[in-house]
Structure formats: structure tokens, C-alpha cells
Amino acid sequence: MGEPQITNDFNGEILLSLVSLVRNRFSPNKETMASDFVTNQEIIIAARCNLTDNVWHYLTGGAESETTMRRNRFGLDSLVFRPRVLADVSKVDPSTTFLGHNLSIPVMLAPIGSLQSITPEGGLAVAKAAAEFGTINFVSSVTQPSLEDIAVASPNPKIFQLYVQGDLNWVENLLRRVKQAGYAALCLTVDTAHYGRRERQMMDRWLPPSRRGVGYEYRAGLTWETLDAIKRIAGLPFILKGVATAEDAALAVEHGVSAIYVSNHGGRQLDHGRATIDMLPEIVDAVRGRAEIVLDGGIVRGSDVLKAIALGARAVAIGKLQGWGLAADGQAGLLRVLEILKDEVVTTMGLLGVTRLDQLNSNYLCKVEPIPPAHEMSAFPHMPGGRLL
């Protein structure tokens, strides 16, 4: 394992003891299994121990001041529950569907580029973990191995995420492969017209392999007319990723999308943006049930998942937490992340007094001042402030 650096704005004694505990318990020299992890906090620390600084900063960092990234947690930490009691919660069902496909819990695996930098299997590990757990994974167009290899790695439905890197002929050739490989839907990412200034990576003098020498001018030129053309070429259920306002959500529905993916790219693109959970209510109002809604951004707990569901999302997607699971122990580490999330979801549903997700609504939530001060790791009590490691 690598040697993590403890920053001055952390309680170094607590964090060092946690790192030491995880290193001793999950040393590469010991016979350990991912099932030995009992919290996702342990998994995150193990991930940090396994990753180089460059890859850690790529996975965990945000754009410029990282304000948008921190607001994702601030928004979630500002919502608290209003539970109901004396309900029979002896049987809790956390399952749902997305675009007609079954999900064991309302959590999908967000697209991540350069997965091969995090785990040797790259996208294969994600596909296998998703199938074993019972969820959908979004396959990034800038990860390895090929979209065909990932498609046949497991039987679960997969959604192909598209970064436009060429003209419509280029798009048509790529989407022909996507359809032949049997992908269930297409997800077009539209919040990367320019590549965000990710200063942790810049100071490392490092960019992931998938970001080098790519034709960003094509993404900078995307319009609603381009979306229509890509949608016609695809002939698949169509998801628009990167929607952040009611205005664009309404336009997306008018252009016939099947689902809207509320996202600020994990705070890695536009600095000083809103938390995705704060965007959600206005987008739900604008969509009015005409498309399904998925959200990512700061989701690391089962309670986070249920906050999004209560505000009208059909499901959420996890990015950073997915990557941390992979870094901790590959496919098995990611599967353990999902198992822990499911346990948290079921426990929280029972304590809220609900047995089905469709019983949740905004009456189960209210706003408060977050405590402790929100940051990207504030869902984990022994990581008290600022950047992790």
C-alpha cells in the first residue's frame, strides 16, 4: 500500500489511527476478503492506501476551488428526516426500476473514464459487480477495455455514455457498435463543453489517459439540434446527462428524452455551481413525470439515496464511491460498497416508517444547518474537515 499524506486541516491523530487500522487489517500480505469491510469508510481509506497521488486526485478532486464538489455534500447534509412511527416495517422492499430494468436498490453505477487507472480490469470489474448485485452500470466511452468486451462481461443491462469526439459520421459509426453490442440505452453527456480546471491534477502535472489529445471542439459545438440528430441515429432510449436547471430539463423533455440525469459532473466541471440535490426539486417540477430522473453528486450513504428519492428522483448513481470500492479491492470491493449501501437503505427505510420507495416524498425531509461543516468527506465522522489524505 502507498503512504498517504495527512493534511494539516485534519485531526491527524484520529486519521492516522484509522489508516493504521485499515493497513494492518487489510494488508496485501494477509488473507483478506472484501467482505471483511464493514463500513464504506474503511473502503475509502483502503482505496487511498492503494492509489497513487495522481489517481487519487483524479478520482476524488474537483474543479478549481472545489466549491461545487463541496456543495454536493453541503446540500445533502442540510437535509434531515422527519420519520413516522408505529408502522409495520418488518418487511422492507428497496427495489425499483429504471427505464423498465430492475434495480435491487435505487443505485446505479455512474460512468467513469480511465477505470483502468483504478483497477486492472477496468470496466469489466464494474460490469461484473453490477450484474452480481443487480443494478445497471453506465459504460464510459473513454474507459477500457472496449465497449464490446464490457458488454459481454456480464448479462445485466448496460447504458453507454457518450462523449462526442467527432462529427455525426463518427457518432454514427460508434453507435452502430453500441447497438450491435446490445446496450440498453444511450446517455449523452452535455456538461463538458470545456474541460474543467481540475487543479489537483494540474498541480500533479497529470491527466488521465482518456483525456489526452481528444477533439473537445466537437463537444464545445453541441446544440439541441445536435442532440436531435444523435437521438435519431441512436434509436435507443435516450438519457441526457448534465442537466442542472428547470429550463434545460423542460427543453430536454420537449426533445423527447427518456430520462434526465441531474449532474454537475461531481463538481469537476463548473466551479461555484449548485448541489445536485438542490437542483432536483425544480427539475422534478419542470419534468412533471414525462421522463425518469436520475441524480449523482456526493452520494455516499443510504440516507443520501433516500433523500434523492424523497425529492422525486427515480434512482441515483455513484461515481467516486464506485471508484473507491474498485481501488480497495476491484470487483469484490465494489460489490461490498453496494452491499453496505443496501444495508443502509433498508435500515433507513425501516427507521423512517416506510416499506416501499414510492411511500417517500418531501414530507419526510426538512432543511437545517449542516453539522459538522460540510465537505466532500463529511458523511464519515472520523474525517473531520477539508481534504482527505
Briefly describe each language-model feature range.
Residues 169-295, 303-307, 311-314, 320:
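Alpha/beta enzyme core
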